[in-house]
């Protein structure tokens, strides 16, 4: 078992951002003597949103992503960001599974199909990803490429499909590569409620060309004719543009939607045995290979271009590897965050990791009991601090976030004050039992309770969050050389204070120096 230089108590406040705007700021306007003292004593604001935490640029942080980054000690990129970076950096051509698909096609029948939702809605897919895949497959010298266009009209205007089709036609013509083979609405291609009769319409079209036959030069007029009859993008019945572009024995199919829920049924029918449920008269092609953009379901047998990343040696695992004991505590609303998410997105409880769940109050909305169970969480933490059994203990305080979401400003002020009182009690116990108290937050919320139009603001924010350290043996750096400080730096900083080495997998940096 490793020896530690200092024992650490980490508090993660949910929804506590930093803002100088006083209007509607439940944090600035609340009485928070403890956090005021800790921030004045030794602290540095850190980033908790957007690319800093692996989310798309400019997107506000959330509790799941926040705790994942805090516990992992690295930026954990979401699937969409990993894909966007590959597209932006033109590295799709180096993707292992895409190269394998290309090799399979070249050695086999020479054919690959790209299937997915073609729009810029950005909820399930993005047309830019399709363009990047076409370019990459051309570079990989796949002889024949067929594209199956699923119409959107839900995350985009109901009649915007002709515009996206024109963009695709122009791109294919410019590249002189690829052939658009099928057009079908997402109503048939992307069902998620086991309405197999809908999926069958898409299935029969992809394999057997069941649908209205036309040519690519007439496709836009055909769709406009459908619009005139109130058949919009989502509900487009199959339009077949190429007999050669049907899915055949030995073909490779790549589905390019990154969101899983509406890809499961169609991919399971094309790539596994589920097609039998469709009761289709069409003969299922032999030896087809299906590939997803992401993992659509853990049980599916086919690969993904961007499989889930496993996060080895997150803080909790590393402490366990070093033979140290730890304690994680939260009330019901945030229990998953201090366990599953903090531990790198795994259910597993590591060796010598103790957990404690404090029940959240049973009220209709938390503005009715703004302190929530903050006192109960503090009680459990103080018990552990007095035991001095663990090298590392951590907890989450839910009130600023959960009450912030109600939009009730006065209640949010009370939530913030209750949280400050709870942290104060923990701080006293830390001093008594020789623990270093470190406080941070997963994202902002309660500092913005009023929207620009004067209405309630109930969402998270993109504001910085505090990161404090109660020991003056450690001083925060002014800045990092190459980037802003962010949540990924919390775990490495905790390890620095504990006096432990960092695992190689942690790419975050300790942001304190010993003085």
UniProtKB/Swiss-Prot annotation:
* S-adenosyl-L-methionine in keyword set: no
UniProt keywords (A-Z) are: Glycolysis, Isomerase, Magnesium, Manganese, Metal-binding
Q: In which pathway is this protein known to take part? A: Carbohydrate degradation; glycolysis; pyruvate from D-glyceraldehyde 3-phosphate: step 3/5
Temperature dependence, free-text field: Optimum temperature is 32 degrees Celsius. Active between 17 and 32 degrees Celsius.
Catalysed reactions, as listed in the record: (2R)-2-phosphoglycerate = (2R)-3-phosphoglycerate
Q: Where is the active site?
A: 63
Query: Which annotated residues bind Mn(2+) 2?
Result: 14, 63, 442-443
What's an example of a GO molecular-function annotation for this chain? phosphoglycerate mutase activity
Q: Which GO terms describe its biological process?
A: glucose catabolic process; glycolytic process
Q: How is its activity regulated?
A: Activity is not affected by 2,3-bisphosphoglycerate.
- Entry's cofactor comment: Binds 2 manganese or magnesium ions per subunit. Cobalt and nickel are less efficient.
- State a single Pfam family of this protein: Metalloenzyme
How this protein's activity responds to pH is stated as: Optimum pH is 7.5-8.5.
**For substrate, which residues are the binding ones?**
124, 154-155, 186, 192, 259-262, 334
Give EC number(s), comma-separated.
5.4.2.12
Cofactor(s) for this UniProt protein:
Mg(2+); Mn(2+)
| Family, per entry | Belongs to the BPG-independent phosphoglycerate mutase family.
State its role. Answer: Catalyzes the interconversion of 2-phosphoglycerate and 3-phosphoglycerate.
Q: What's the protein name? A: 2,3-bisphosphoglycerate-independent phosphoglycerate mutase
Name the source organism. Answer: Onchocerca volvulus
- The gene that this protein is the product of is ipgm-1
């Amino acid at each position: 078992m490793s020896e530690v230089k200092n024992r650490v108590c980490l508090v993660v406040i949910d929804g506590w951002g930093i803002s100088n705007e006083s209007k509607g700021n439940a944090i600035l306007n609340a009485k928070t003597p403890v956090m005021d003292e800790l921030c004045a004593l030794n602290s540095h604001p850190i980033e908790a949103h957007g690319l800093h935490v692996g989310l798309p640029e400019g997107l506000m942080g959330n509790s799941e992503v926040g705790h994942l980054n805090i516990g992992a000690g690295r930026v954990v990129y979401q699937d969409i960001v990993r894909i966007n970076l590959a597209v932006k950096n033109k590295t799709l051509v180096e993707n292992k599974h895409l190269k394998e698909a290309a090799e399979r096609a070249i050695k086999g029948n020479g054919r690959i199909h790209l299937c997915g939702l073609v729009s810029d809605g950005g909820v399930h897919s993005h047309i830019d990803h399709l363009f990047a895949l076409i370019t990459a497959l051309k570079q990989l010298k796949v002889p024949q490429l067929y594209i199956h266009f699923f119409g959107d009209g839900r995350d985009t205007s109901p009649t915007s499909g002709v515009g996206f089709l024109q963009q695709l036609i122009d791109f294919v013509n410019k590249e002189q590569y690829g052939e658009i083979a099928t057009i079908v609405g997402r109503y048939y291609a992307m069902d998620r409620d086991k309405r197999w009769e809908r999926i069958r319409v898409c299935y029969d079209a992809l394999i057997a060309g069941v649908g209205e036959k036309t040519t690519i030069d007439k496709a836009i007029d055909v769709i406009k004719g459908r619009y005139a009859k109130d058949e919009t993008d989502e509900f487009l019945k199959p339009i077949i543009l190429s007999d050669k572009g049907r899915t055949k024995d030995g073909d490779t199919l790549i589905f390019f939607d990154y969101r899983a829920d509406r890809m499961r049924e169609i991919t399971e029918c094309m790539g596994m045995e589920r097609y039998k449920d469709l009761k289709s008269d069409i003969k299922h092609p032999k030896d087809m290979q299906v590939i997803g953009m992401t993992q659509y379901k853990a049980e599916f047998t086919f690969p993904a271009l961007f499989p889930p990343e496993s996060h080895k040696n997150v803080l909790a695992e590393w402490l366990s590897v070093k033979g140290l004991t730890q304690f994680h505590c939260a009330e019901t609303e945030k229990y998953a965050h201090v366990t599953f998410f903090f531990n790198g997105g795994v259910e597993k409880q590591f060796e010598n990791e103790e957990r404690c769940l404090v029940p959240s109050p049973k009220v209709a909305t938390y503005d009715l009991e703004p302190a929530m169970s903050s006192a109960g969480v503090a009680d459990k933490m103080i018990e552990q601090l007095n035991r001095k059994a663990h090298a590392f203990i951590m907890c989450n305080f839910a009130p600023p976030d959960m009450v912030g979401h109600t939009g009730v400003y006065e209640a949010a002020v009370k939530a913030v004050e209750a949280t400050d009182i709870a942290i104060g009690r923990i701080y006293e116990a830390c001093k008594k039992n020789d623990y270093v108290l470190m406080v941070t937050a997963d994202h902002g919320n309660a500092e913005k309770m009023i929207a620009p139009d004067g209405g309630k603001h109930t969402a998270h924010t993109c504001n910085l969050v505090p990161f404090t350290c109660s020991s003056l043996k450690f001083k925060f750096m002014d800045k990092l050389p190459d980037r802003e400080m962010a949540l990924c730096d919390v775990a490495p900083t905790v390890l620095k204070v504990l006096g432990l080495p960092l695992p190689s997998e942690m790419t975050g940096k300790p942001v304190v120096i010993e003085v």
